[in-house]
Curated annotation (Swiss-Prot):
Stimulates the secretion of gonadotropins; it stimulates the secretion of both luteinizing and follicle-stimulating hormones. It comes from Tupaia belangeri (Common tree shrew). Midbrain. Residues 22-80 are annotated as: Disordered. PANTHER family: GONADOLIBERIN, PROGONADOLIBERIN-2. GO terms for cellular component: extracellular space. This is Progonadoliberin-2. The modification Glycine amide is found at G35. Its main location: secreted. It is found in: Secreted. Keywords: Amidation, Cleavage on pair of basic residues, Hormone, Secreted, Signal. GO terms for molecular function: gonadotropin hormone-releasing hormone activity; gonadotropin-releasing hormone receptor binding. It holds the Pfam family GnRH. Belongs to the GnRH family.
């Protein structure tokens, strides 16, 4: 048992002595100074980081929604969407039903020419 413990300690000492130094995956605070300031040569420096090119004004304007370019169903308010596809006969029937339920006098039927 003593020899296995000695072997383990010897292996641990060998690994610690042969350590190559800091790895590429360093702690998040590497390169930071007290007060939240970064070292200017730090790879996390915002000036040294590559940034994607900014989109052109035309691309930005094209990404915004326009009422002129909206599809017809998007331009109809939600109240009108429920009856937008209904025929005139269905709408008249709905109005008669609502008016008769409210107790209002029933309007005369208007003949529809086919």
């Amino acid at each position: 048992m003593a020899s296995s413990m000695l072997g383990f300690l010897l292996l641990l000492l060998l690994l610690m002595a042969a350590h190559p130094g800091p790895s590429e995956a360093q702690h998040w605070s590497h390169g930071w100074y007290p007060g939240g300031k970064r070292a200017s040569n730090s790879p996390q420096d915002p000036q040294s980081a590559l940034r994607p090119p900014a989109p052109s004004a035309a691309q930005t304007a094209h990404s915004f929604r326009s009422a002129a370019l909206a599809s017809p169903e998007d331009s109809v308010p939600w109240e009108g969407r429920t009856t937008a596809g209904w025929s005139l006969r269905r709408k008249q029937h709905l109005m008669r039903t609502l008016l008769s339920a409210a107790g209002a006098p029933r309007p005369a039927a208007v003949p529809i020419k086919p």
